[in-house]
Amino acid sequence: MLCIKKMSFSNSNAQHTGGGGGAAASVASSDSYSGSGSGASGSGSGSDNVLVIKTVQIAPVRTLMCALKEILIETNITFQKDGIRIINMDKSHTMLAHMFLEAVNFELYECALDKIIIGVNMFHLFKLINSIDNDDTLTIYIEKKDYNDGVVSYLGLKFENGDIKQCKTQKLRLIEPDPEDLVEPQVAFSSVINLPSCDFQKIIRDLSCISEKLEIKSVGNELIFRCSGQFATAEVRRVESDGSMEFLHKKDSGKIIQGEFSLKNLGYFIKCTNLCNQIEMYLDNDMPLVVKYYVASLGTIKLCLSPLPSS
């Protein structure tokens, strides 16, 4: 089980937060709204909206939604002045996803309130996002009429394609937000490793054919992936080298760091592969494994997996 309240990830030299995890709080009522002129929804001027976000980075957003729907069935999404946050666990409480997309990285980001929290079925959101074309511009918005004293009933999505002069508008019916207050775990990790995301994907895919469990071990300047199944065993060794694998931080080069993790759950992690070229892996004994992906230039998502019990 993951214990995630009142903590945040870091290596032992510097805090590793990627923007932090906003805790749930009472949202300001619509009385505190001051217009955010953007005209996003096709339903009037910008003053009709409490939230307007615009991006042309369609492929990363689609990839992100595809990965999150496998881990989180339902989740809160928090919109604040500085960006968008998701922090939640899967139903088994063995995986945690923490996403932060910074406001400054969007083509347009206007949040009229200090905090807006919505509850979303991730599969339903993915079904809507998945229909967007890579050439479209995506606008996410919340109309003032759909915001009532901190409760949001609909999330608007607008797809615009200037080449064919087409505008498609959809509104996702929202669910009640989870009242539980989650923040990002704060943990000091002994080892932080940089690895190509496609290499990590291939290792996980290949070893998933052999076993359900994967041992990850850091020894000296080596990173070792090892598994054992009914019909075979396998081992992949990576040595630190320029452009391939690099230890960004290792507290004690002589210390052996290892843990055993579910390959099925790691299979959900590698759905983020196309988001970036390199991942950061955070390792320590008797600690969750954390894999950090960059969501193109929008922000980061950190995926956390608790170790399997010792056999």
Residue map of PLM features:
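DNA polymerase sliding clamps and clamp-related checkpoint/processivity subunits
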Residues: L2-K69, I73-C209, E215-S311
